[in-house]
């Protein structure tokens, strides 16, 4: 029986969980308000980082009732401890739908809404609720882009364990500047992605067609590659095939893949696009199919293109495939210059940029030691500075 005192302790197995019967009095923003037992000391006693409070609150029934009793919280936590033996299993258990053993995109929404509501680095969003869902969509896509290595749309315990996601959730508590958390949560990164999408989405229905996407970066990407992106090879749902449009969520994957072609997901993304027959290997025919358009575009710019045979020799020398006559996903992941390979076949601007650099300097760039910024982080930082400068110069980017 729980007495109505300000501070109570409950012993649960080996845990001593302090529970505030009248709220924790914390500025951290307990999701259940005044009567929520999830004070920081309770979370600490459970061995949970602060920003697990949302999932814990929902899992104990708080989402339905608006509050959580001590009894419900203890019963819920006992079940978690009995069934889950590490943080990844606990986190999946707290967020998943009953009867599942994996997480789908929607499962992350309550957790991320709590981050938006209570993280000091996102306090300015209180007045801009229309951006909540767009920021949350962006973070969810980044989570699945990095963590869901199987491309299944379902994050398993094993995938979560192999990722850095839970370490990043723990860092939310320590880092007041959310923009320092560049892997998933950075607001500046969201802002860059959303502004880039907004420029292309002229009717602002949060959908873009192939002509809209072709305008990205001044038509740098070939028509054949744009067609492949809209073929369904790298998008979810049937809207692409039915209506010829991709969503903002699809665009997040596209932009991160386009600006950083060295990550495993990005290499898989572009490999899927180039593998026209889906046989798991890029044939010489497939390479020529994409290179033909590059040659035509170079001709129109009065630049002499390398004959395909010469280009092919260069690329085979670059990738060093295991089997003759085809390039596999494994070959490209092993090669440190996958970005140069892909840009050669479908991004005219970046292809010309690589051509101006010596291969040795390209390799040196890719092998530099230390915590070097990723290509995506460099791009996002540069673009954010440009956006801020444009706004300061009186070209405000506004939400319609």
Language-model segments: which ranges?
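Amphipathic alpha-helical scaffolding segments
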Residues: 55-59, 90-97, 106-114, 158-168, ...
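Long, highly charged low-complexity segments
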Residues: 1, 16-28, 169, 188-191, ...
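HEAT/armadillo-like alpha-solenoid scaffolds in large eukaryotic assembly and transport factors
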Residues: 123-132, 178-182, 215, 300-305
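Primarily EF-hand calcium-binding motifs
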Residues: 11-33, 37-78, 85-105, 126-154, ...
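Polyampholytic low-complexity alpha-helical segments
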Residues: 1-33, 39, 45-60, 83-93, ...
